[in-house]
UniProtKB/Swiss-Prot annotation:
The record marks C154 as: Transition state stabilizer. Pathway: Amino-acid biosynthesis; L-methionine biosynthesis via salvage pathway; L-methionine from S-methyl-5-thio-alpha-D-ribose 1-phosphate: step 1/6. The gene is mtnA. GO terms for molecular function: S-methyl-5-thioribose-1-phosphate isomerase activity. It is an enzyme of class 5 (isomerase). This is Methylthioribose-1-phosphate isomerase. It catalyses: 5-(methylsulfanyl)-alpha-D-ribose 1-phosphate = 5-(methylsulfanyl)-D-ribulose 1-phosphate. It comes from the Bacteria. Catalyzes the interconversion of methylthioribose-1-phosphate (MTR-1-P) into methylthioribulose-1-phosphate (MTRu-1-P). Its EC number is 5.3.1.23. Belongs to the eIF-2B alpha/beta/delta subunits family. MtnA subfamily. It comes from Thermotoga petrophila (strain ATCC BAA-488 / DSM 13995 / JCM 10881 / RKU-1).
Length: 343
């Protein structure tokens, strides 16, 4: 079986990933033939976005089986999982996908067609992601009024998933239902996912989009130019606290101050029932060069100290609702999240 979307392409013996570091100027795919190459692609943000990372890791696990040569197969596959798992610590979909693949592996370890079984599980996961995103979009579109201007942060679109997107999936679904929507995409320093990816993606779809700098959002809210904020998520705690791209917390505070609804759009797989609150979510610290350089050019003095957390945590009191494929979760979040999860 094969898979081909804008984000990724699986041919049966390799995984091609759209190199999102080079967008919007160059559309180029990186071919991964080993699990180490997949791990490198995740770590270096060739592919990014929690759902996309999860499915990519699943295919990496499949390639890991092909990479096996001698010794204990179970020990080898544990090593494959560890290699993929340590690439990005915050996005829970990565660990969810790898745990799911490992379970299938141990259930079928003695089968002759083990590679095919694992490949089918990864493909199933990929196609499930598309359907889940469309369900998120349908549920979220009901919250968006005709003529709305939506502010979104980072990129939670087709590029962050297998296809369609979570936050941008809500916008797509609203448009498909006949509503007129305008989007403000903040640039999202330091990696500029909003300016580079979200703007590119929405323009491809013919959706009206404006790029704004990150520090414009509060003023635009105060002037009444923003009707709702819709963002994605990398990990959601049991109480609804949400880790997402750095800068999300600031937008949530500003939205609360200006009485603007703040929505998180994410699959149920992004909810981590082992994490009680946002204080327990690990935050990835990335390289200083991502802050001191832009487009390969230095923009800060040599030797300056840098902080570069990739994510922040928005507490549940700032969130209006969490939009999932199983429905819209409103406060009290912990109680209603447990109902959705069946725990």
């Amino acid at each position: 079986m094969k898979l081909k979307t804008k984000t990724m392409e699986w041919s049966g013996d390799s995984l091609k990933l759209l190199d999102q570091r080079k967008l919007p100027f160059i559309e180029e795919y990186v071919e991964c033939k080993t699990h180490e190459e997949v791990a490198h692609a995740i770590k270096e943000m060739i592919v990014r976005g929690a759902p996309a990372i999860g499915v990519t890791a699943a295919f990496g696990y499949v390639l890991g089986l092909r990479d096996y040569k001698t010794g204990s197969l179970t020990d080898w596959m544990k090593q494959v999982k560890e290699t993929l798992a340590r690439t990005r610590p915050t996005a829970v979909n990565l660990f969810w996908a790898l745990n799911r693949m490992e379970k299938v592996f141990f259930e079928n370890v003695d089968r002759e067609n083990l590679f095919e079984i694992l490949e089918n599980e990864a493909l199933k996961m990929a196609y499930e992601d598309i359907e889940v995103n469309k369900a998120i979009g349908k549920n979220g579109a009901q919250l968006i009024k005709d003529g709305s201007t939506i502010l979104t942060h980072c990129n939670a679109g087709a590029l962050a998933t297998v296809d369609y997107g979570t936050a941008l999936g809500v916008i797509r679904a609203a448009m498909e239902s006949g509503k007129r929507i305008r989007v403000f995409a903040d640039e999202t320093r330091p990696y500029l996912q909003g300016a580079r990816l979200t703007a590119w993606e929405l323009m491809k779809d013919g959706i009206e989009v404006y790029v704004i700098t990150d520090n414009m959002a509060g003023w635009l809210m105060k002037k009444g130019l923003i009707d709702a904020v819709v963002v994605g998520a990398d990990r959601i705690a049991l109480n609804g606290d949400t880790a997402n791209k750095i800068g999300t917390y600031s937008l949530a505070v500003l939205a609360k101050r200006n009485n603007i609804p703040f929505y998180v759009a994410a699959p149920v797989s992004t909810i981590d029932p082992t994490i009680k609150s946002g204080e327990e979510i690990p935050i990835e610290e990335r390289r200083p060069e991502e802050v001191t350089h832009c487009g390969g050019n230095r923009i800060a003095p040599e030797g300056v100290k840098v902080l570069n957390p990739a994510f922040d945590v928005t507490e549940n009191t700032l969130i209006t609702a969490i939009i999932t494929e199983k429905g819209v979760i409103r406060p009290p979040f912990e109680e209603n999240i447990k109902k959705i999860l069946g725990v």
